[in-house]
Regions:
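Class I SAM-dependent methyltransferase Rossmann-like catalytic core
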Residues: 8-19
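Short catalytic micro-motifs in class I SAM-dependent methyltransferases
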Residues: 103
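Conserved alpha-helix/loop element of class I SAM-dependent methyltransferases that forms part
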Residues: 19-37
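Conserved Class I S-adenosyl-L-methionine
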Residues: 166-248
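Conserved catalytic/acceptor-binding region of the Class I
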Residues: 118, 122-187
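A short acidic, Gly/Pro-enriched loop at the edge of an enzyme's catalytic core
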Residues: 87-98
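A short, conserved alpha-helix within the catalytic core of class I
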Residues: 108-116
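Class I SAM-dependent methyltransferase SAM/SAH-binding core
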Residues: 38-40, 46-88
Length: 248
């Protein structure tokens, strides 16, 4: 089954509102990869993870099926963007040191994708996939976000979202496990940035399509009251990370 595109229509919002991944994540992956020649970021979107990889690898190929997402790409001299689905990659056999999938593995055709990874991976190459769940701000803000997530747009999440909710624990991952230290995404955001992030959820877009109204607007006042008078607050997303090694 081909990969589904959930984010093209909100590509600009996605780029503007998604949090950055911690630099320690990319340092760790570079340390465990067998070499630093070529990294591949699948379902790259606008290249958010690809730029983190570019600090450590001589070349990064960043692939995505969405022309709208690639139009928002972040240029870098060591990053080459390609329009391709993750299950059919324009990459030579046994050429890649590291494969990453950031916040997207649950959308892929996993058997086809894993077969493609076995084809392109060098002996001992590393495969890493990560996801993050709901933002954590304060108990009051978190309660409003949880109400939006569950009560208001809960029916509009695709079934694959359950893999995110389990932190990818229930996702098949047929590679030799590599243990990683716990990591989190952290950002100091104003309230408007959090609201933009909530608007980038795929379920919010599906709810808009079905109802004609903006579900985030329905909780804006409650979010503002819970947020209080702070100009910005620290937002935290615990990262769920699966890392493995291909056959040597």
């Amino acid at each position: 089954m081909p990969t589904t595109d959930h984010f093209s229509r909100q590509a600009a919002l996605y780029r503007a509102s998604r949090p950055d991944y911690p630099p320690e994540l990319f340092s760790f992956l570079a340390d465990v990869a067998p070499a630093g020649d070529l990294a591949l970021d699948c379902a790259t979107g606008n290249g958010q993870a690809a730029l983190g990889l570019a600090r450590h690898f001589a070349e990064v190929v960043a692939a995505d099926l969405s022309p709208a997402q690639l139009a928002q790409r972040r240029p870098h001299p060591r990053v080459r963007y390609v329009a391709a689905i993750a299950e059919q990659l324009p990459i030579a056999d046994r050429s890649v040191d590291l494969v990453t999938v950031a916040q997207a593995l649950h959308w892929l055709d996993l058997p086809a994708f894993f077969a493609e990874i076995r084809r392109i991976a060098r002996p001992g190459a590393v495969i890493a996939a990560w996801t993050y769940g709901l933002a954590q701000v304060t108990p009051a803000v978190d309660n409003v976000v949880a109400r939006l997530y569950t009560d208001i747009v809960g029916a509009y999440w695709p079934p694959e979202r359950a893999l995110v909710e389990s932190g990818y624990r229930d996702l098949p991952f047929p590679f030799e496990p590599i243990q990683a230290a716990p990591l989190s995404l952290r950002a100091d955001w104003p309230l408007d940035r959090l609201i933009g992030y909530l608007g980038s959820w795929s379920a919010v877009q599906r709810c808009k399509d079905a109802t004609g109204s903006d579900p985030v607007a329905s909780v804006r006042d409650a979010l503002a009251a819970a947020w209080g008078g702070a100009a910005s607050r620290t937002v935290v997303w615990p990262l769920a990370l699966r890392v493995g090694r291909a056959a040597r």
